[in-house]
Regions:
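Boundary at the C-terminal end of the N-terminal hydrophobic targeting segment
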Residues: 24-33
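Short beta-strand-initiation
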Residues: 13, 34-36
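Structured, acidic catalytic/metal-binding patches in enzyme active sites
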Residues: 37-248
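Extracellular/periplasmic catalytic domains that process cell-envelope and extracellular macromolecules
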Residues: 32, 42, 264-266
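A cross-kingdom marker for long, charged
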Residues: 239-300
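Bacterial N-terminal signal peptides that target proteins for export
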Residues: 2-13
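Short, conserved clusters of charged catalytic residues that mark active-site
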Residues: 33, 63, 255
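Bacterial N-terminal signal peptides
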Residues: 11-21
């Protein structure tokens, strides 16, 4: 199918798009030596650090390094995918605006009959009545159920990389800005075809039983700075359709590269933290910067 998502959606959410999703915490799995990838763009009066994140982490995961801490301390401004990452009200308002529509088919009819029992189990675990899901657009239902998967893995939004990086900037009164808004991020899903949305929902339901091992492998790849391991999630065309890849990755990476190129024209030191998937693979932000004559040097 052109809308194939198999085995890739969960990892895309954690390292690619969803910094506003969340759940509760458990102990972290064993990790390799911490060395998450970081790059630097620099000229005579401007320095931009690029750091790839995981949007949700388990409790106790070690990932900080001296090089990263020095870059954060020396930066005047923090740039995230979404600045108000912990603003649940903004997320709820955006979801209500974009994710609810009248006249939709029942949610049970939007997955194959063989998968309905598994989906209903996740709906029950979410604590949201199925009648509410019937009113949600398919992409919104998928995101809501993805939260069940995160909860099962013990992931905590307060421990996500963006929240932890943001604290020293906010407490010291430094600027924190976003490349996008929550509504803009949800809007990427809202523009997907219904076929792509249903593939997304089915993928969330099917992946729920498989994600523990996937998450452990992806987390180790991120922690150790294994770009090839991260990129496999995003470059495998059997895991992401061209429609999804364009909407959620390629177009956004190009827009961010444009933003970075403009930012390099102004003096100062900036720390940019975005999902690790955007900084790995064939359509990475760095490769798009290279087309503009800007080379990001890996420094960790």
């Amino acid at each position: 199918m052109a809308f194939g998502l198999r085995k890739g959606w969960f990892r895309l959410a954690l390292a690619g798009l969803l910094p506003f999703a969340g759940a509760a915490a458990e102990a972290a799995p064993a990790a390799k030596a911490a060395r998450p990838a970081m790059w630097k763009l620099a000229d005579k009066d401007t320095t931009v650090y690029l750091f790839g994140t995981i949007h949700l982490l388990p409790k106790g995961r070690s990932w900080r390094t001296p090089a990263m801490e020095a870059a954060i301390k020396g930066s005047d401004e923090l740039v995230l995918e979404v600045a108000n990452i912990d603003d649940m009200m903004a997320g709820a308002q955006a979801m209500a605006k974009l994710g609810i529509s009248p006249g939709l088919p029942p949610i049970a009819e939007r997955v194959p009959e063989a998968k309905r029992a598994a989906m209903r189990s996740m709906i029950a675990e979410s604590g949201i009545p199925e009648a509410v899901y019937d009113r949600l657009e398919t992409w919104a239902a998928a995101l809501s159920l993805l939260g069940v998967t995160f909860k099962r893995l013990g992931l905590d939004p307060s421990l996500g990389v963006e929240n932890q990086i943001g604290t020293p900037f906010r407490t010291s009164g430094k600027s924190v800005v976003g490349l996008e808004t929550v509504e803009q991020q949800l809007g990427y899903f809202d523009t997907l075809s219904e076929g792509a949305q249903r593939a997304m929902l089915l993928s969330v339901v099917e992946e729920s039983a498989e994600t523990k091992a996937q998450f452990a492998a992806m987390l180790d790849a991120w922690t150790s700075g294994d770009l090839k391991g991260i990129a496999r999630t995003f470059d495998d065309e059997t895991q992401m359709s061209p429609e999804l890849k364009s909407a959620l990755m390629s177009k956004r990476n190009a827009a961010w590269a444009d933003w970075l190129a403009r930012r390099m024209e102004k003096p100062g030191t900036v720390f940019v933290a975005v999902g690790a998937g955007h900084l790995a693979g064939a359509d990475s932000v760095q490769k798009m910067l290279r087309k503009k004559g800007l080379k990001a040097k890996r420094v960790q």
